Amino acid sequence: MVTLINCFEVPAGREEEFFAGYRKVNAYMRAKKGYVSNKMHRSLARDATFRFVNVVQWESREACEAAHDAGFRELIAQPALSSVRSTPALYEVVHEATA
């Protein structure tokens, strides 16, 4: 299992536009082989650099890479998303703790 973490710099006043675009991408990705789960986080601080942080789990690195295909690239080319800076990277768990 791998985790894609993507932080988004969304300009003030563009949150709803961004989130509408994100929902389209999420619907597309959820149908992809190897998709496990997704959580989109929104900062409680309105002046945070990264207003949104997306955490997506995939069965494997290969599944994640295969899902980022031409259809995905077409969706993220829409102005609501293409004008937003993002920092995607894949991560593996190196430590986990629970209460």
Predicted feature descriptions by range:
Residues 24-36, 57-92:
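An amphipathic, aromatic/His-enriched active-site/gating alpha helix that lines ligand/cofactor pockets
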Residues 2-9, 39-69:
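Short, well-ordered beta-strand segments in beta-rich or mixed alpha/beta enzyme
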Residues 2, 39-50, 76-99:
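Glycine-rich beta-strand-turn "strand-cap" elements at beta-sheet edges
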